[in-house]
Design a protein with these regions (language model features):
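Charged alpha-helical signal-transmission linkers that cap and connect PAS-family sensory domains
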Residues: 108-111, 128-129
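PAS-family sensory domains
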Residues: 113-123
Length: 139
């Protein structure tokens, strides 16, 4: 089938159905997009998460550092590490602290104005704990 006859990709379905957590927060840090992967990872339904501060999934001891980095990225229009994946902590609805591999991107409109931040996340808890156990056994 020629590609010029294909309709545009169904981005909303892709975002909704991808296994990884996809989250968008606006410039004030309010959750505006939350897919099924985010529901599975953090335990909050979209109805529970949308409209809430992203503090919902950030452990209390990491919130100040998060907000410093977020505000810097919003002012600068870019994250300090680009789209590099980093392992950080997340907070599940049941109170468990997770290890989460996350990448972030500042989202801008067509005129270059910063709209907020998008994050892609994946559970890294099992891998992180296995690495810790290997280090402890080796050392």
């Amino acid at each position: 089938m020629p590609t010029d006859t294909l309709s545009p990709p169904p981005w909303e379905r892709i975002v909704a159905d991808v296994a990884d957590a996809l989250i968008f927060i606006d410039g004030a840090g309010v959750i505006r997009a939350w897919n099924a992967g985010a529901e599975a990872l953090f335990g909050f339904s979209a109805a529970q998460a949308l409209g809430q501060s992203v503090d919902l999934i950030i452990p209390p001891h990491l919130r100040a550092a998060h907000w410093r980095g977020f505000e810097h990225a919003m002012r600068r229009g870019a994250t300090s590490r680009g789209a590099a994946v980093r392992t950080t902590r997340g907070l599940h609805q049941d109170g468990r602290k997770l290890y989460v591999d996350m990448s972030f991107a500042v989202v801008k409109d067509a005129d270059g104005r910063v709209l907020g931040s998008a994050a892609m996340a994946r559970d890294a808890t099992a891998r992180y704990l296995a690495e810790q156990a290997r280090r402890a056994a080796a050392g």
